[in-house]
UniProtKB/Swiss-Prot annotation:
Forms part of the ribosomal stalk which helps the ribosome interact with GTP-bound translation factors. Is thus essential for accurate translation. The keyword Ribonucleoprotein applies. Homodimer. Part of the ribosomal stalk of the 50S ribosomal subunit. Forms a multimeric L10(L12)X complex, where L10 forms an elongated spine to which 2 to 4 L12 dimers bind in a sequential fashion. Binds GTP-bound translation factors. It comes from Rhodopseudomonas palustris (strain BisB5). It comes from the Bacteria. Belongs to the bacterial ribosomal protein bL12 family. This is Large ribosomal subunit protein bL12. One of its GO terms (molecular function) is mRNA binding.
Length: 123
């Protein structure tokens, strides 16, 4: 039993990247796919409620944070607005920055704005 506890402790200390690498190694070693296991496990509940994954997102500026000038520059670059319009948008947060974008684009825009110091939500 102590060996199992040690394994649990070791796994709990892994970073997300290390856990993902471990999953890949185990998939290769055992010849299985983690995605297939999730699909099989989810199958009984799927009949109860089929939930579609969201495909369109709205990038919402929650707040500008401490670096308002940097956030205004990023908003201008993303939206193509003029300086005054971008400043008004940032100061009027929470406001949508871009609507109807796919998940990858939304994540990219969120990362850009957060790097500039903004707090961003995806809806």
């Amino acid at each position: 039993m102590a060996d199992l506890q040690k394994i649990v402790d070791d796994l709990s200390s892994l970073t997300v990247l290390e856990a993902a690498e471990l999953a890949k190694l185990l998939e290769e070693k055992w010849g299985v796919s983690a995605a297939a296991a999730v699909a099989v496990a989810a199958a009984p509940g799927a009949a109860a409620a089929a939930v579609e994954e969201k495909t369109e997102f709205t990038v919402v500026l929650a707040s500008a944070g401490d670096k308002k000038i940097e956030v205004i520059k990023e908003v201008r670059a993303i939206t193509g607005l003029g300086l005054k319009e971008a400043k008004d948008l940032v100061e009027g947060a929470p406001k949508p920055i871009k609507e109807g974008v796919n998940k990858d684009e939304a994540e990219k825009l969120k990362a850009q704005l957060e790097k500039a110091g903004a707090k961003v939500e995806l809806k």
